[in-house]
Every structure is written in C-alpha cells, then in structure tokens.
Amino acid sequence: MAGNFDSEERSSWYWGRLSRQEAVALLQGQRHGVFLVRDSSTSPGDYVLSVSENSRVSHYIINSSGPRPPVPPSPAQPPPGVSPSRLRIGDQEFDSLPALLEFYKIHYLDTTTLIEPVSRSRQGSGVILRQEEAEYVRALFDFNGNDEEDLPFKKGDILRIRDKPEEQWWNAEDSEGKRGMIPVPYVEKYRPASASVSALIGGNQEGSHPQPLGGPEPGPYAQPSVNTPLPNLQNGPIYARVIQKRVPNAYDKTALALEVGELVKVTKINVSGQWEGECNGKRGHFPFTHVRLLDQQNPEEDFS
C-alpha cells in the first residue's frame, strides 16, 4: 500500500537545516517508512532523505545538478539557456522532490517504502537531548527479553535511557541503536567517565561518533535498492522468505510465528508495516521487515 501523505505539501516533510543526529533523534523508534527531508550539511545544494527502516535510521543523499530547485519547485520555466535542475538518488533521477517522494511511495528504498512524514509535534517534545543531559545505566544481569517490546542485553552493557513510562520498566537504547523496554531491577545508574562512552550510544547507525547538534554530517550514506516496487496482490499470490526469526507474544493469537528460511504467502499488505499471511498452515500478522519478497516473475527459483 502506498504512503498516505501529500508530496506537494512541503511543510509536512521538509525540515531545512537539520543535522544527522537531530534527524536520528526524531526518527529513532518510529514505525517503518516514517521519514523527513533535510538539507545536506556537508554538500550545499544537496538534500538528505532520512528514513526509519529495519530498526534503524537510514540516510540517503539526494544530489542536485544545476541550479538548486525550490522546495517544492516553482512551475515557472527556467530562463533560456539555463538547464533545469535534476535530483539524483542512487541510480534514479527526478525533476523535483515531490516526484522523488511519489516514486518511493511505491518503490522500496532498502526495506521500506515511504509511508508518512515524521510528526512535527516531536520537535518540541524534548526528544532531542544533548549528550550531557542523557541518562545511562549499566546491566547487572543478562536479560533475554520476554516479548517484542523488550530490549535484550548482556551483563555489563551500557544503555541510554530514553523514557520512563513505568516505575519498573524503562525505555532504553543500546550501542547498536536498538530500542526497547528494560527491567529496572536488572540495571544500575551509570555515569560515563568520558565523552567517548556517551558518544557510543544514541549516535548515527554507521558507527561513527555523533557530532554536536547542527554540526558536520558524519558517516556514509545508504543506497536505495534498484527499482523494487511494492507488490500488488491483485496480480496474484505473493510469496516471501523469512529472514528474521519471530517469536510472538503467547497472548497474541493473531501473530504469526516465523522461522528463518520458511516460505510465507502474503495475503494483505498494510500501510502500518504489519502484513498478513499464511505460513505452515497458520494465518496471522507479522512485521514486513522479517521477510524478503521473492522475485514474483521467477518465484520458483527461490522455492528450492
């Protein structure tokens, strides 16, 4: 299902000058396909498409050739002798940002299409914290997690606290950027001895240290996949191969358990990212990030 946003409504998705760290803070923990467009801080005139996908935040550079177009571009024709600007992302070229966003409504970047812009209400919610304001804990015991909302960790791991919704359960983030709920009795408060420890957690997903807010753009950019369209169930059955094991909550009878390598018949594609399907004679819902769609033109090549 295509994204539910108006690509011509600039104010909903364009954030102007925003650092990578600020973009991560806005998008981390959002559902797959939530995105924003910002100015590149290292390449003036270019843009960056930042997207929440596969439990991380990916950043795709959008290179602009020729005069930088307005956002969205004016319908006026360029002066004689001036070539119109072109926008390139990966191997794709577009005349405007709205055209680019429309394309990725129905084509995958890596593991998701564009679903909706991040809400601007998060800008004033205190979600962006400077490192000195962050709170950390150290694990006293191993914790394997009991359900999908939990964040597993090992004894000695350093975690960054993001929120405290309950007295005994806090929301935390590990050094890989994964987030989830942790049991408070399993951890102790921890104060980093140096900035290098705090920089390790809560930074960008490419492994380089986060920069000060509004600072340079660290780390490499992701590359979009080549022309992978969102499948259309009206064209016939769609199959996918499980790439990540899933053990659903025992109390959720509508969730589908998955084992790596199993074949899933997709029966419904929801914009939320929770798809529905059949596997081993059982029907239920599952996160689409746990499967890889097979080549619908030659599915038999993947069935073996």
UniProtKB/Swiss-Prot annotation:
CC annotations in GO: actin cytoskeleton; cytoplasm; cytosol; membrane; neuromuscular junction; plasma membrane; protein-containing complex
InterPro entries according to UniProt: CRK_SH3_C (IPR035458), CRK_SH3_N (IPR035457), SH2 (IPR000980), SH2_dom_sf (IPR036860), SH3-like_dom_sf (IPR036028), SH3_domain (IPR001452), Tyrosine-phos_adapter (IPR051184)
Known tissue expression: CRK-II is expressed in all tissues and cells whereas CRK-I is expressed at lower level and in limited cell-types.
Location of this chain's protein in the cell: Cytoplasm; Cell membrane
SUPFAM superfamilies registered for this protein in UniProt: SH2 domain, SH3-domain
Pfam family, one: SH3_2
Source domain of life: Eukaryota
Main location: cytoplasm
Site (Proline switch) residue list: P237
Ranges where the SH3 domain occurs: 132-192, 235-296
Phosphotyrosine: residues bearing it: Y108, Y221, Y239
Effect of Q244R: In NRK-23 inactive mutant
Post-translational modifications reported in the UniProt record: Phosphorylated on Tyr-221 upon cell adhesion. Results in the negative regulation of the association with SH2- and SH3-binding partners, possibly by the formation of an intramolecular interaction of phosphorylated Tyr-221 with the SH2 domain. This leads finally to the down-regulation of the Crk signaling pathway. Isoform Crk-II: Phosphorylated by KIT.
Record-annotated SH2 domain positions: 13-118
Modification type Phosphoserine: residues: S40, S41, S74, S83, S125
Family per record: Belongs to the CRK family.
Binding partners and assembly: Component of a complex comprised of SH2D3C, BCAR1/CAS, and CRK. Within the complex, interacts with SH2D3C (via C-terminus), and BCAR1/CAS. Found in a complex with ABL1, ABL2, CRK and UNC119; leading to the inhibition of CRK phosphorylation by ABL kinases. Interacts with ABL1, C3G, DOCK3, DOCK5, MAP4K1, MAPK8 and SOS via its first SH3 domain. Interacts (via SH2 domain) with BCAR1, CBL, CBLB, PXN, IRS4 and GAB1 upon stimulus-induced tyrosine phosphorylation. Interacts (via SH2 domain) with several tyrosine-phosphorylated growth factor receptors such as EGFR and INSR.
Function statement: Involved in cell branching and adhesion mediated by BCAR1-CRK-RAPGEF1 signaling and activation of RAP1.
Entry domain remark: The C-terminal SH3 domain function as a negative modulator for transformation and the N-terminal SH3 domain appears to function as a positive regulator for transformation. The SH2 domain mediates interaction with tyrosine phosphorylated proteins. Mediates interaction with SHB.
Protein name: Adapter molecule crk
Organism of this sequence: Rattus norvegicus (Rat)
Organism classification: Eukaryota, Metazoa, Chordata, Craniata, Vertebrata
